[in-house]
Amino acid sequence: YFSAWPVLEKEVREGRMEWSKETCIALYDSLAEQVNQSFPAFMEQAFHCPREMGGLIKAGRETVADRGLFITKKRYAVNAIDIEGKRLDVEGKIGKTKATGLDLKRSDTPKVIQEFLLEILNKLLAGTGREEIVERIKEFKYEFTDRPGWEKGSPKRVNNLTKYGEEEKRLGKANMPGHVRAALNWNTMRRMQGDNYSMQIVDGMKVIVCKLKSNPLGWTSIAYPTDELHLPAWFRELPFDDSEMEATVVDGKVDNLLGVLDWDLGAATNTENQF
């Protein structure tokens, strides 16, 4: 991404240059055209590429945005007001959120968390201040706390389940990814309960991984198939570690998104010991 603001800030503040959305769009369109005009000469000088070949490569101005959140390389979100010549801040809209590489697009982020992250991101890019966003996060955390434990897990896809299961039988105890262990725990508990109705987890299946509190079996997590429509009573009665899952899927995801702002959201949105 590129911003001309650091170069032009002094002129704008001194009133020697107009700075508006239209000015920005025209400026960046002009920059893109100048890059295209100068590129063949650059290719010729740097790589001895014939000018007619260097002229085959054309760059286009993609997005102009008025606000942005830049976390790391290839992880950012902006409020786009123009994408490839199409204005988006029309008919009462402030623009369109364009996000890349963020948790709200990751498959291991629960759908309800994706929607919440998008909500607070939209608020931020619309100019909402810290206090209002903090209050919304706290409100959501109270709502999320009221959900049953199995709705607080993290989505995963289980691969090589058969391989790790056979290795476990052969060695007695085998090292494996945590979500695979959680899937095997579901299958084991299903057999222990004599449950022939619930789905068995097999290779390649999508599951939800839930953390567990200390228990006689020594398990730290258990998974269930996302396609299982009727969770059995034995599963719903397990000692889910709600606080651990809430910290992972709410606090962790919010920090990944907004931590770059240094707002100390962990302390500001703590809902424990409030009374």
Task: Tell me the role of every PLM-derived stretch.
Residues 1-275:
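DNA-dependent DNA polymerase catalytic subunits
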